[in-house]
Structures are given as C-alpha cells and as structure tokens.
C-alpha cells in the first residue's frame, strides 16, 4: 500500500511541475496572435482610442495582466519545485514542512487559477467586441494576421483545469498519507502491547 501511495505522490508532484511549466509557456504565448493582428492598428500608444479597428485596444489593455500572469506562473513553478526540495514527492512519512508545502502549493494553485480565469474571460469578451470586418480590411491592406480565433483564451480551461485537479489530488494524497501513518502507529502500539 505504501509503495502505491509513494508512487502516486511522485507522479502528482511531477505532473504539477509539468502543468506549471506549460502555464508558463502559455503566459509567453497568449499575446502572440494579438500582437500580430492588433499591434499596428493603433498608431499612437498614448491615444488608444484612435485606431483603424474598433476595439483593438485589448492588446494594450492586456499588457499589465500579461506581466503579472508571467510572474504568477514563475511563482507557481517555484512552489512546485519546493515540493521536491522538501522531498514531498518521495517521503514515506510526511513532516510538518511537507504538509505546509502541500498547503502552499494547493492554495497558490487555486488562487492562481481563479484569478487567471476571471482575467482571461474578461479579456476574451473584450477581444470578441472587436469589429472583425475592420480587422479583415486592415489585415488585407497591411498584410498582417487576421484572426477571430479565441484559442489562446480558451486553452486556459484545459491548463487551469489540470492545475486544479492536480492540487485537489495533492491534498487527497496528503490526507491518505496521514491516514496510513495513523494506521501504522496503531499497529505499532498493538505490537508493543502484545510484547509487554
């Protein structure tokens, strides 16, 4: 039973690190199509409403979010790395530090997911308000990218869904670990009583 449990926690810790790295890559790519399609629609960044495409200011509006999103994804990677530093992925018996680390990763993952989901959905709505007829005309004139795709907005459902599932399983694993340790201590106590 312990081997299965330890194997599961190794897989969970590694999976959380991989998902966090994918979210980091996502934070680097989320603005790519917006840049290619919308950057040159605004002639003067100091006057965002003077544009050849109505609504194209979403690219500029997302800049601060994207900076914070990148920083938050790095923090999430560091939190997941801390699982390996505290050896949470391989300990048969958890110490208080392992439980604290597990709680930090879980809280960070849930908070990050809720915050990012709200922001990305708001910017997706702003993107969908763009006048796509004007964008098509602009793209034809300037030979720039034309897209109505919301792929970069929608993929967050998969990534943050995996993160939330991962942290829920990490918490479940810690509870399971605690239960196994209590059962082991009860067996040891019974053995000591029988020997006495």
PLM region spans:
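Hydrophobic alpha-helical transmembrane segments
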Residues: 96-100, 155-158
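Cytosolic juxtamembrane helix at the C-terminal end of the final transmembrane segment
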Residues: 2-8, 85-97, 120-128, 162-195
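Hydrophobic alpha-helical membrane-insertion segments
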Residues: 15-32, 100-122
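Alpha-helical transmembrane segments and their immediate interhelical/interface regions
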Residues: 1-5, 55-93
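Loop-to-transmembrane boundary segments
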Residues: 5-15, 147-157
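Interfacial non-cytosolic loop connecting adjacent transmembrane helices
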Residues: 34-66, 115-154
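Hydrophobic cores of alpha-helical transmembrane segments in multi-pass inner/ER membrane proteins
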Residues: 75-80, 157-171
């Amino acid at each position: 039973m312990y081997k299965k449990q330890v194997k599961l926690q190794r897989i969970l810790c590694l999976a959380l690190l991989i998902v966090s790295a994918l979210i980091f890559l996502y934070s680097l790519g989320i603005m790519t199509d917006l840049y290619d399609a919308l950057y040159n629609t605004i002639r003067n960044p100091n006057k965002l409403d003077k544009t050849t495409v109505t609504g194209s200011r979403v690219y500029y509006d997302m800049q601060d979010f994207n900076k914070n999103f990148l920083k938050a994804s790095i923090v999430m990677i560091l939190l997941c790395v801390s699982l390996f530093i505290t050896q949470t992925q391989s300990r048969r018996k958890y110490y208080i530090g392992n439980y604290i680390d597990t709680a930090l990763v879980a809280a960070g993952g849930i908070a990050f997911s809720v915050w990012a989901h709200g922001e990305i959905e708001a910017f997706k709505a702003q993107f969908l308000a763009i006048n796509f007829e004007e964008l098509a005309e602009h793209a034809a004139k300037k030979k720039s990218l034309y897209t109505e795709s919301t792929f970069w907005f929608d993929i967050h459902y998969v990534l943050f869904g995996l993160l939330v599932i991962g942290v829920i399983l990490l918490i479940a694993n810690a509870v399971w670990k605690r239960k196994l340790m209590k059962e082991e201590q009860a067996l040891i106590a019974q053995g000591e009583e029988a020997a006495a």
